[in-house]
Amino acid sequence: MKKTIILGMIICVPSISMAQWSLERCIDYAITHNIQLRQQENNTQLKELSLSTARNASLPDLSFGAQESFSFGRGLTADNTYTNKSTNSTALQLSTSVPLFTGMEIQNRIKQAKAELDAATEELEKARNDIRVEVAKYYMQAVYGHELTETARRQVGIDSLQTERLRQMLKAGKAAAADVARQEAALAQSRLTLTQTETDMRSAILSLRLLLELQDDKAFDIIMPKHDYDKIAGMTIPSAEFIYEQALTQRPEIKSGMIKLKSSEYNISIAKAALYPKLYLSGSLGTNYYKTSGIEMDGFGKQMKNNFNQGIGLSLSIPIFNRFQTRNNIRAARVEHLSQQLSMENTKKALYNEVQQVYLNTVSAKARYTSSLVARDSSEEAFRLTKAKYENGKASITEFNEAKNDMLKSESDLSRAKYEYIYQMALIDFYCGKDLKF
């Protein structure tokens, strides 16, 4: 209960002490701090390392080896007799090898690693898009909650003035006690509605705050967007076919699928590389030192110099038969390629369904907005006329409250329809490759 009260105080404090957050700021913050996105970024970095490893496979390797050995005991001498002796030897070698031809395996692995990095980058962008849409949805709910609360406050203000007016009229004997009681009940209901809308608004802001993973001590409130009703009504909805065509060229999930399809083609080429011979160039530098007890031999430095040796060679490996492993690897790579083709078609189908649903939702939202706009204008005019009749004693308090409630309900319905339509239009622009904003 204490936390609820504190939260209410934070949200109800004047905006001068609040940090005002726009939708763009919320999205940027979420993208920067979301844990899942940061994990996805780590995966992209791993793909970058894999690409570096694939590129470095064409470089020569270099290794250094050293060996020191000792032996003790009886051994055969040069005059064919046995005697106790000890020997020790030292060997040093520097060797290198470089691939000259591997059936284009290295080149195709580089292409595949680059494709996997590009696919991971697009998948990261898709994850960012998901966050953008989620933040926009919660932000819009918070905006709607703000506007609904303002409408409820207006209702409380109207009912408060009307209640006070009737009380004064009752004292003057110009109003019935029953009318005052009904108006006081209407005021109590208006205050209850305001309490509920404030609770819903706080809940929406809290949900947005939790999505952004904001720290508890960070002040937070949203900036209310401003929209012209005529401009909103004049917005044109593009065709579903146009939206889908644009989405096919812009959406990261489509780009990622196409890149993965290309990567699977490289995988077939990598498997086929095992059919070709492999040629390596190798080279080495080495020297050694040897000493036997009882025999006079050159010193360490002289032996190391005199025993210095160099070597160069070519290594050719020609595959003949490996128990059909290469054949099966090629077949498996082709099956994976076919699976990726099906996955690509499924991704396109899912995108088509999404676009159709967004288009239908937008058309419906526009129809609701247009109808709500007419209903709002009509209810405002009806309230104006009823209010004039009531003030002239030609309408009852019940008729006045009914007209007032109809007007305020139409305003609430218009707010909901307006923001739903704005959100759906923003989604259409987003599917067409534009920034998500409203």
Features from the language model and the residues they span:
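Sec-dependent N-terminal signal peptides
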Residues: 4-14
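Bacterial Sec-pathway N-terminal export signals of envelope proteins
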Residues: 18-63, 67, 73, 216, ...
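Short flexible linkers and secondary-structure junctions
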Residues: 20-138, 279, 283, 324-327, ...
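Sec/SRP-type N-terminal targeting helices
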Residues: 38-42, 55-56, 86, 100-128, ...
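Short segments within alpha-helical structural elements
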Residues: 42, 189-214, 376-434
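Small/polar, glycine/serine/threonine/aspartate-rich low-complexity segments that form flexible
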Residues: 65-98, 226-235, 269, 282-318, ...
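Membrane-embedded beta-strand positions in outer-membrane beta-barrel channels/transporters
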Residues: 93-95, 139, 244, 313-315, ...
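Periplasmic alpha-helical coiled-coil/stalk elements that build and connect Gram-negative outer-membrane
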Residues: 130-246, 361, 365, 407
